[in-house]
A protein has these predicted regions:
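Short, charged, intrinsically disordered terminal tails
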Residues: 96-108
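Juxtamembrane/membrane-water interface recognition
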Residues: 18-21, 40, 102
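Amphipathic alpha-helical segments that form the core helices of the histone-fold
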Residues: 25-50
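Short, charged, amphipathic alpha-helical segments
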Residues: 32, 85-96
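Hydrophobic packing residues in well-ordered alpha-helices of helical domains and bundles
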Residues: 38, 64, 88-92
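A broadly structural signal marking compact, well-ordered functional cores
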Residues: 1, 89, 105-108
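Amphipathic alpha-helical oligomerization segments
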Residues: 2-26, 47-86
Length: 108
């Protein structure tokens, strides 16, 4: 399975935006145009996020596949209403940024 760090970052941005608005809209239920717009926003965000300090092995994970799976699990839990927006962002962003830093060779 290929894990797209940009899509995961877009999903994190979606969690932040909809969570702040008091909504909880699953990624899959967004119109394709909205998903594409969030993905473009995420790609543009990478320049600013590169200066932020994130751990290289969040939650003790080092393998890109494990990092991506953990991020996806957090996002899925948020969509099901099992995780708060703040918790999802606090735990998910370090995971996604570690995956982004792993580069294309880190994408299984």
């Amino acid at each position: 399975m290929k894990h797209d760090p940009i899509e995961l970052l877009a999903r994190m941005a979606h969690v932040h935006a909809t969570g702040e608005a008091g909504e909880r809209v699953p990624w899959a239920r967004l119109a394709p145009e909205r998903r594409e717009a969030r993905t473009h926003e995420a790609a543009a965000m990478l320049g600013g996020l590169g200066r932020a300090s994130y751990p290289t092995n969040p939650e003790g994970l080092t393998a890109p596949r494990d990092i991506a799976s953990a991020a996806e699990a957090l996002l899925d839990a948020w969509e099901r209403g099992e995780a708060a927006t703040g918790e999802t962002m606090a735990r998910g962003m370090p995971l996604v940024m570690a995956l982004v830093r792993s580069g294309p060779e880190g994408t299984p």
